[in-house]
Amino acid sequence: MEHFDASLSTYFKAFLGPRDTRVKGWFLLDNYIPTFVCSVIYLLIVWLGPKYMKNRQPFSCRGILQLYNLGLTLLSLYMFYELVTGVWEGKYNFFCQGTRSAGESDMKIIRVLWWYYFSKLIEFMDTFFFILRKNNHQITVLHVYHHATMLNIWWFVMNWVPCGHSYFGATLNSFIHVLMYSYYGLSSIPSMRPYLWWKKYITQGQLVQFVLTIIQTTCGVFWPCSFPLGWLFFQIGYMISLIALFTNFYIQTYNKKGASRRKDHLKGHQNGSVAAVNGHTNSFPSLENSVKPRKQRKD
């Protein structure tokens, strides 16, 4: 295993250059194998988990879900605050920021971004809860792609570009996750569900986040600094892939659902009644079908 790890390190160095020594010895960062193994285990659970649960009753997980979502909401809020203050204190340049130009503020950003990397490992639990609760329809290609790739990408980011221009996408994503995990936490409380009308706006916020990240990353291409250009091009490509997948998800989830509701609404009016609007069917059975003829008494 050590020989394999040494070979990987040699390959990475030849392809990406020397690692950033400021993160040497940090948990999970010296060796890529643990991150890779965690990702493989995640994909195996995604594949085998629904098969295991197929003939079993779903778990509620309500209590632990509330704690989990609260924990990630607070962690995301902490990361957002620390990144914003670190960028402000270091006087980061929006257009392009190198990885060794802000002294102690860079170290603050690095420490927070390590938590951001580690949070991507914690977020594997999103999928595991879907499996345990048998919400398999939520385990989409987008969901698995996003979760499986982010942990691996951020291992490389933390080893080669752990601060500087890397901060922007993580800052926006932390803010979006404050909203998202707050929503998930509240949705696990049945009495709160009727008031949670803003789910689609979280998806819109995610799309805006990706577009803004592309814009800010592109600034580093046109107004370059010491931040490596290769990383900027990679991030632009990755953001484009997420925009494509999230846009498809948004269309499938909201636009088609809205069109289906309008169609059902129109059909209901044509039949003289409104049958299915906003996902709810008419709670009153038709009089024609519900009134049964009385049997004649034999006495």
Curated annotation (Swiss-Prot):
Belongs to the ELO family. ELOVL5 subfamily. InterPro entries: ELO_fam, ELOVL5. It is an enzyme of class 2 (transferase). It holds the Pfam family ELO. One of its GO terms (molecular function) is fatty acid elongase activity. It catalyses: a very-long-chain acyl-CoA + malonyl-CoA + H(+) = a very-long-chain 3-oxoacyl-CoA + CO2 + CoA; (6Z,9Z,12Z)-octadecatrienoyl-CoA + malonyl-CoA + H(+) = (8Z,11Z,14Z)-3-oxoeicosatrienoyl-CoA + CO2 + CoA; (9Z,12Z,15Z)-octadecatrienoyl-CoA + malonyl-CoA + H(+) = (11Z,14Z,17Z)-3-oxoeicosatrienoyl-CoA + CO2 + CoA; (9Z)-hexadecenoyl-CoA + malonyl-CoA + H(+) = 3-oxo-(11Z)-octadecenoyl-CoA + CO2 + CoA. Pathway: Lipid metabolism; polyunsaturated fatty acid biosynthesis. Interacts with TECR. Keywords: Acetylation, Cell projection, Endoplasmic reticulum, Fatty acid biosynthesis, Fatty acid metabolism, Lipid biosynthesis, Lipid metabolism, Membrane, Transferase, Transmembrane, Transmembrane helix. This is Very long chain fatty acid elongase 5. The modification N-acetylmethionine is found at M1. Residues 279-289 have a biased composition (Polar residues). The chain crosses the membrane at residues 26-46, 64-84, 112-132, 139-158, 168-187, 205-225, 227-247.
